[in-house]
């Protein structure tokens, strides 16, 4: 725990908030709260020179990003932190703090994953644990290595403290107003829940990219790489903690995020307006599903959702064949051992999503901002 943001300080926030609520309750007339902006903290495993997933957030004037928190997932923490810091420099949005979080999952590890593969099945995408390559794109045994980036290293530094502490601080400063948006493994969110039991209930809602169900057949008939619940199985214990916490609302963006893939045609639309951001996005984007972009777009504009179902959801944490697999139940058959009802997005307005994504990617980058 950093000296600047200790657990004792977190407790003082909680106590101060309690006293304030008591004073307001004692008064005969309370002032009406001012309308809140769409306040969001975005937690992700930012990896690569283009962080196009943040564009629906920083390109939408109705959204106020309180901060970006970083977690190991697709890459290691330090490399991911450098990637998002550099992209924010390109976008001239270094006013938004970036806070480092968990370097490792709560329980899972590379060794455990290799052992699981030896007993059950090969995992195509292992994120930070992918086999090492000649260019250090992946370096599974060196979590502190930051390979050279094609867009150069960042000059800015991450904010002090840890992601979990920052998450807790912000929901106490803005109770019931902050959307916790997660598109990577859920380690940071789980740590915040364990540090402060009031954290989840003080947030406005949780939206997360994950909760892919019925992926087994999709791995046979489609892509074994795309039909995977990486964010869940990378840290199943964290996912279990998060999905059993008392959120006001939980939204899962799972299989629907496979529906839209980055194409040259989309790149051409984005490139029609030349800015440092659009040039970076078009140059480094790959032909992959827009998993995180769809998730952030839904957080910025919930009306993009055209279909959803509700079900109870949790994650298998037994270290067997189904370790890290998401399960859903109707109310009648759910075990009711703490799992929560989740809004599972099943359809979005794809045309409007793409139109808004192009618009957000082309946001005017201020020339006079450092």
For each of these PLM feature ranges, what is it?
Residues 1-10:
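N-terminal secretory signal peptides that target proteins for export/translocation
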Residues 15-26:
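Bacterial N-terminal signal peptides
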Residues 35-38, 52-65, 230-370:
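Conformational coupling and interaction surfaces
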Residues 35-94, 109, 135-252:
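Active-site histidine-anchored catalytic micro-motif
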Residues 102-106, 187, 210-213, 254-261, ...:
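Glycine-rich beta-alpha junction loops
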Residues 115-134:
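A charged helix-plus-loop insertion that forms the helical arch/lid used to bind
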């Amino acid at each position: 725990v950093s000296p600047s943001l200790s657990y004792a300080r977190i407790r003082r926030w909680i106590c101060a908030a309690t006293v304030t609520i008591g004073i307001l309750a004692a008064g005969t007339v309370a002032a009406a709260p001012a309308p809140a902006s769409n306040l969001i903290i975005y937690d992700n495993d930012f990896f690569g020179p283009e962080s196009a997933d943040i564009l629906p957030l920083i390109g939408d004037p109705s959204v106020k990003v309180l901060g970006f928190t970083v977690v190991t997932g697709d890459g290691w923490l330090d490399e991911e932190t450098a990637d998002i810091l550099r992209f924010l420099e390109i976008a001239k949005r270094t006013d938004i703090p970036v806070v480092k979080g968990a370097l490792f999952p709560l329980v899972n590890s590379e060794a455990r994953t290799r052992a699981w593969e030896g007993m059950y099945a090969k995992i195509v995408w292992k994120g930070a644990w992918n086999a090492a390559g000649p260019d250090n794109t992946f370096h599974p045994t060196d979590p502190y290595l930051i390979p050279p980036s094609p867009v150069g290293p960042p000059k800015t530094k991450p904010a002090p403290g840890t992601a979990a502490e920052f998450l807790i601080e912000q929901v106490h400063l803005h109770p019931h107003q902050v959307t916790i948006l997660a598109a990577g493994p859920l380690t940071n969110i789980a740590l915040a829940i364990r540090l402060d039991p009031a954290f989840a209930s003080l947030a406005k809602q949780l939206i997360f990219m994950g909760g892919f169900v019925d992926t087994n057949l999709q791995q046979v008939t489609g892509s074994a790489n795309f039909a995977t619940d990486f964010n869940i199985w990378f840290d199943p214990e964290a996912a279990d903690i998060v999905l059993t916490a008392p959120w006001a609302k939980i939204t899962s963006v799972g299989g629907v995020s496979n529906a839209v893939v980055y194409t040259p045609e989309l790149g051409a639309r984005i490139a029609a307006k030349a800015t440092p951001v659009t040039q970076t996005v078009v140059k480094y984007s790959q032909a992959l599903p827009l998993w995180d972009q769809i998730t952030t777009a839904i957080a910025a504009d919930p009306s993009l959702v055209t279909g959803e179902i509700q079900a109870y959801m949790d994650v298998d944490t037994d270290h067997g064949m189904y370790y890290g697999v998401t399960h859903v139940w109707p109310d009648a058959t759910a075990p009711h051992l703490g799992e929560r009802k989740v809004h599972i997005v099943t359809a979005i307005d794809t045309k409007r999503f793409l139109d808004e994504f192009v618009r957000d990617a082309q946001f005017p980058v201020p020339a006079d901002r450092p």
